[in-house]
């Protein structure tokens, strides 16, 4: 994973985590939260598969979470992250869908 892709993946992880912990009063579809959590898991798994040390990955995600936590749901950014993930990770869309099915 290139440094540019890693930075984007961290940003997307932060956006996805913010989606999961939306402030009260925000409207959203529950399936969006499921897809966001599954996407975080798939991005981390892929990062580890490509040789990024887990501590390095987690540090980057934590910084991104701090950046986006408490923000309102941004459908455009979320969709851009889905497109990024699906382009970056082979079978990314299928991997996310598979994880969604195992969340419960």
Named regions from a protein language model:
Residues 30-104:
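Compact alpha-helical subdomains of small soluble proteins
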Residues 2-51:
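Short N-proximal segments of mature Sec-exported proteins
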């Amino acid at each position: 994973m290139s440094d540019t892709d890693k930075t984007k993946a961290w940003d997307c992880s932060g956006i996805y985590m913010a989606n999961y912990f939306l402030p009260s009063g925000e409207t959203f579809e529950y399936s969006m939260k499921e897809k966001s959590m599954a996407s975080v898991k798939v991005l981390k798994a892929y990062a580890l598969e490509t040789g990024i040390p887990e501590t390095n990955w987690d540090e980057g995600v934590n910084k991104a979470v701090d950046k986006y936590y408490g923000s309102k749901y941004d459908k455009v950014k979320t969709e851009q992250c889905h497109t990024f993930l699906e382009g970056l990770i082979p079978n990314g869309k299928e991997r996310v869908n598979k994880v969604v099915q195992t969340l419960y």
